[in-house]
Amino acid sequence: MSSAEPYTPPPLPSPFTNTTPPPQLLTQGAEAHLYKTVFLSPSTPAALKVRPSKPYRHPILDRRLTRQRILQEARCLVKLVREGVNVPAVLALDWEGQNTEKGFGGAWLMMEWVEGLVVRVVLERWERWMKRNQGSSGAEELKEEENWVRDLLRRIGRAVGALHKAGVIHGDLTTSNLILRPPGHVGEQADTGESSPSMEGDVVLIDFGLASQSLQDEDRAVDLYVLERAFGSTHPRTEPFFEEVLNGYRESYKGASSALKRLEDVRMRGRKRSMIG
C-alpha cells in the first residue's frame, strides 16, 4: 500500500506569499488554517488565520460567505477587547473578493499572538500527574493540587461570564479554545513529568470562528453545555469539579441565574437525545 501524500495547504493570501520568515502552519481545520507569523517587525509574533476559498461553492456565494464570516469574527473580537475581555486583539484583516483564481478568493485575519498552553494540555498534564502520584503523595499535597485546579476552573468560568456579559456567544467552547497565559507572558512550560503543571495566569479565549452576538439565555446555556460536555469527554478526573466553572460564571456575570436555569433545560434535552440515540 502506498503511503499517503503529505498535505499541501492552499496558497497563502498575496500579502504573505513572500514574507520572511514564511508563516508557520500550526493547525488546519475544515474552515480555516492557523499560522504563526510576525507583525510589522520580526520581534512581534502574530497569529494569522486564513479562510481559503471553497472551490466547490459558486464563486459569488463563496466570496460573500467568506467575507461575512471573517468580518463577524473580527467584530466579535473588537467588541470583546473594548469590553475588557481576555481575547486576542485584531491587528489586520482583508479578503480577496476580486481574485477568482483557484486557491485564492479567501480571507485572512491577523491577531495578537497569545503565549501559553491551551487549557486542554494543562489539564491533561495535571490529570497524568495526579494518576502517577495518587498513592505516593500525602493527602494534604493532593488536596492542594485539587485547590489549584478548582481555582483554574473558577477563572475559566469568570472568563466565560465576561464573554456572555459582553453579549457574545463563542459557539465552540472547549478547553482547546482556552489558553492559560502565564504571568509575565513567558513561553510554554516544559512537561518534565516530575511536577504538576503551573496553573497561574490569565485565561484567554481564542478561536471565534463560530462566534455570534446574542443576548439570549438559550444561546448562553448552549455555550456552557458544550463546555460541560467537553470536560466530560476529555477530562474525566477534572469533570467532578466543573461546578467551579459555574461558580466563577456567577461571580463575573450578573445575569448568570437565568442562563444557568436555562442550562438545566438544555441538559434535559441532551439526556433525552442520548436515551433516544
Curated annotation (Swiss-Prot):
Domain Protein kinase: 20-277
The protein's Enzyme Commission number: 3.6.-.-, 2.7.11.1
GO cellular component: chromosome, telomeric region; cytosol; EKC/KEOPS complex; nucleus
UniProt protein name: EKC/KEOPS complex subunit bud32
Record-stated family: Belongs to the protein kinase superfamily. BUD32 family.
Biased composition (Pro residues): 7-23
GO BP field: tRNA processing; tRNA threonylcarbamoyladenosine metabolic process
Positions bound to ATP: L26, T27, Q28, G29, A30, E31, A32, H33, L34, K49
Domain characteristics, as noted in the entry: This protein is considered an atypical serine/threonine kinase, because it lacks the conventional structural elements necessary for the substrate recognition as well as a lysine residue that in all other serine/threonine kinases participates in the catalytic event. BUD32 has protein kinase activity in vitro, but in the context of the EKC/KEOPS complex, the catalytic subunit KAE1 switches the activity of BUD32 from kinase into ATPase.
Gene Ontology MF term list: ATP binding; hydrolase activity; protein serine kinase activity; protein serine/threonine kinase activity
Complex and partners: Component of the EKC/KEOPS complex composed of at least Bud32, cgi121, gon7, kae1 and pcc1; the whole complex dimerizes.
Keywords noted in UniProt: Activator, ATP-binding, Chromosome, Cytoplasm, Hydrolase, Kinase, Nucleotide-binding, Nucleus, Phosphoprotein, Serine/threonine-protein kinase, Telomere, Transcription, Transcription regulation, Transferase, tRNA processing
